[in-house]
């Protein structure tokens, strides 16, 4: 082939659009016809290979049952929390609502078949022959994990299809001339599919990072071409910012905005994990007394926990049968969560109290006693060691004695202010010294042991109901000591000054503007994503974490085969890994033998350039999509999560075979 390199000031260089000039990756009408036939053929073969009873069977898979339930939640406009972004649920919900398909399993099968169609187009884009491309289809379609996902309603089928569209669009952009109609068509497709991919599963964010890195590499090629003008470079940067960053990010935010605005019905089994701020959005304004008074019954919520209600159960510590267990509960509405606020020295009687002025409000810095309402025992800190944390500076928290016990210094707690900023615009507000429910973030300091009440994510064993451990520490980390008074029951029946709390705002009147502002939406958006992440590893799989300790280690994915895949598939599986190893060895040899001072012109081969260019893309893509799972905080990781990395390794294998064949 003719040498298409251009002459620079000192030596020849490769223009940024060398692939387009050489006709690399140019698709013909026949290629698109083949891709369409691949989709139809794969769909028909798998559909016909099973009976109608197989496709219409009840949801017999945990993943199907979960996805079906979430779809119903979305259609009912009920609140739910799940570890994945919302677009997959929205996609299947729209199909069910509009009755586009009578069976959602057919939709999943079509998405899997479309993934194969785009794989064929991708291999043709990287200049593989049709025979080599067909080999890639044979490899992926015979992976048992991939086949199984096409026969169930799957969280992954949509993500895999969008992923293949992203890779196809990106490779099409890399071989197209900047600013042409073809370039714009592919960058728009990339932008939309990328936005939908990150809105379907969070692994899409890794794909997003891969695309950004690849565009940085394209930018390097662009500025290395001396014939590219400054205007062209500026246009490239602006278009990349728009189509690679802004539009995908906007689609992601719009997807969540649609989800949040769809929540019209509260679901306590899920909403209990959300903050008071978020719950007021779901349940409406919450009316509470403007101050906390002695004699009130309260619930205390630990702000650093998913639910975290301070609770005591009629369970003794194994090491001390006289002391009653105190923990952070995962139940929102439970009698064990209720505590009476008692004065440290006065024995208050409310039978002759007829006016709010006769009630004593609790001030910051004052001491209180916390009596467990259902058992009558007092909250205390002692020198005994907690059941899980047994450091020298840790003290056990328990409930002790009975309802007649008045307590000593170990049962007295100073209430200290951490934060109180809601509706506090005045610097000299007389109400600032009082504790305010739903507003004041507080911590408790024990007078006897001189330690702070603390909750953390460590869970108690089965005898402690797998709830979170509570302890007292001399020098605690402040965020883990932060509590909020979530609800208050007054000790009297008459009316006292009340406030209405709604999405972080306080009003003393019944009329309130319930329209979401941008700041409120961003707060809800940020909290929902954070709770999704923690719900996944701490709630959904946290209690049963031990169950997954013997599961597939992520590091074993590349060398562990599916037992149900064909025998010949073993060679393709290990061959894909071998092709990446060989590529890295070739690149190492190139770097070792590189001499920047030589005056000799290196030989040029377009096939070699294609191999180097797309080989690096495959290596980086494989590594990013694989390495992210080694940092997972839990062990519930299925082999199907290796799909994106396997996809890149197969592309590397096919490109290597094509390079050898040519």
From Swiss-Prot:
It is an enzyme of class 2 (transferase). Pathway: Protein modification; protein glycosylation. It is a multi-pass membrane protein. Coiled coil: none annotated. GO terms for biological process: protein O-linked mannosylation. It is found in: Endoplasmic reticulum membrane. It comes from the Eukaryota. It catalyses: a di-trans,poly-cis-dolichyl beta-D-mannosyl phosphate + L-seryl-[protein] = 3-O-(alpha-D-mannosyl)-L-seryl-[protein] + a di-trans,poly-cis-dolichyl phosphate + H(+); a di-trans,poly-cis-dolichyl beta-D-mannosyl phosphate + L-threonyl-[protein] = 3-O-(alpha-D-mannosyl)-L-threonyl-[protein] + a di-trans,poly-cis-dolichyl phosphate + H(+). Residues 289-344, 359-418, 432-488 form the MIR domain. Pfam families: MIR, PMT. SUPFAM superfamilies: MIR domain. Its EC number is 2.4.1.109. The chain crosses the membrane at residues 27-47, 160-180, 196-216, 236-256, 483-503, 566-586, 618-638. Residues 1-26, 181-195, 257-482, 587-617 are lumenal. GO terms for molecular function: dolichyl-phosphate-mannose-protein mannosyltransferase activity. Glycans are attached at residue 347. PROSITE patterns: MIR (PS50919). Keywords: Endoplasmic reticulum, Glycoprotein, Glycosyltransferase, Membrane, Repeat, Transferase, Transmembrane, Transmembrane helix. Belongs to the glycosyltransferase 39 family. PANTHER family: DOLICHYL-PHOSPHATE-MANNOSE--PROTEIN MANNOSYLTRANSFERASE, PROTEIN O-MANNOSYL-TRANSFERASE 2. Probable protein O-mannosyltransferase involved in O-glycosylation which is essential for cell wall rigidity. Transfers mannose from Dol-P-mannose to Ser or Thr residues on proteins. This is Probable dolichyl-phosphate-mannose--protein mannosyltransferase 7. The lineage of its organism: Eukaryota, Fungi, Dikarya, Ascomycota, Saccharomycotina.
